[in-house]
Amino acid sequence: MFVLVFIVFASGLTFGAEKDMVQFQGVLMTVDVKNRSMVVNEKLCVWNHQTLINDATGSPTTFDRLQTKNWVYIEGVYEKPHHRIVAKTIYLLPNRIDEKEKGLYPFIK
């Protein structure tokens, strides 16, 4: 019984180690709405049906507003095996948000 519990627990640790929460802002370099993917700061980001997209005020908006050279803030999970970030929430930003301005955007951590 102990061995079975240990194996299940150990495998849970392994899966958890392959995914990390990430939060960052950056410039959209490419966007492929058909394949639900984009490159932000040279990082591959994908989204799915659960991903939320909001404007800078936190109000919901649509994925067709994603355009190259625009700034975004991404909250997601880095999947090490696939070398990509699965976005949980995407925020459209007016520009790069520096330390002094972060208080204006409560979602930026």
Regions found by a protein language model. Give the residues of each.
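Short, structured beta-strand/loop micro-motifs enriched in basic residues and often containing a Trp
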Residues: 49-57
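Short, flexible, surface-exposed loop segments at domain boundaries
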Residues: 1-44, 56-109
